Amino acid sequence: MADETTVAPVSGTILVVGGGISGITTALEAAEVGYEVFIVEKNPSLGGRVAQLNKYFPKLCPPSCGLEINFQRIKKNKDIKWFTLTEVEKISGGPGNYDVALKQSPRYVNGNCTCCGKCADACETEIPNVFNFGMDNRKAAYLPHEMAFPQRYVIDPSIIGSKAAQACKDACPYNAVDLDDKVKSFNIKVASIVWATGWNPYDATKMDNLSFGKVQNVITNMMMERLAAANGPTKGKMVRPSDGKTVNNIAFVQCAGSRDENHLPFCSYICCLASLKQTTYIREANPESKATIYYIDLRTPGRYEKFYKKVKEDANVSFVKGKVAKIEEDPATKDVIVTVEDTLSGKKIQARYEMVVLATGMEPSTATVKVPGNAKYDENSFVIPAEILATGCVKKPSDVMSSGQTATGTALKAIQMVRR
């Protein structure tokens, strides 16, 4: 059963809130040893941040590697039920006997959908593509992305009641477009709850000196992932936003918000690795290209040190120890001017680049949307596992591999709570 709201109260069921890699892993580990699991995801599809990556560690695989296998496991497991476009409104009760109120937003497309795409073909209205961080537009009738699970289109609520919405309905040969779809509220009974709502990129506009949102060719590390992806806004071409020019000279600014008492006081763990990885994107796209990484300290824990050494051997990748003071734009060329003090030489540097990538930090989703129940947090709004368990990046900054590992352990804890 998927995306259905007729759920009977079940004693011993585990609720996983968040359908990213951590939530999916927790759900599968519990379900595959015989426990019933509900997955609740606020977006139209499962997959989370991993689905937005071009490649991920440790093997630099595309996200289709891990996600497709996990989606197949979910589809084949009768003990997993998922609810997309759904949020937790309220949690009552305690371990062993939770009553959870859910709200499901309308999708306006029912289970008859075959992903033929005729609704999108008929829709003339476009909206910003949030999957690509607004770097392009998509039709208001859309599949979230090519790997989306479930494979079902969505009609954006902004066009409901318009001619564009009616055109979508008229174009569908399977009677799958339901413009009368409504918000649904319902309750489920569960024995344990795992919060796995992940992270959000830190808002780069809060760092005024780095000029994100003011200088067009300054982007974030997650935007860089989408640029490099074959299903991204440029189909994987390394071009800059202002004019579509191929990028041959790029800079990466580390700790953009992280390790800063005015923003995120903690290290976000993956930012250095992400920038090292992204230098390979630009270098592979153009062997003549050059990349510079501005850093405070480079942190590559465990086996990732080997990857750092490999990147460092590339003569076209430079490393400058120093905190970037200012980023400006050359109005004539749209190039980006970076001002930084080189900590090792003591010299002030002003360098020109075609594009700059900010390594923005990880902010737990609970920094903005709290758990509507009895949850505990640390001083940075990460969830401390207690009555309500937590896993993945809502618990601490993590990479994909460690997120999967902690999710397995969390599944065991959830099972122990059920069996008390």
Question: Where on the chain are the PLM-derived regions?
Answer:
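Residues forming the flavin
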Residues: M1-R420
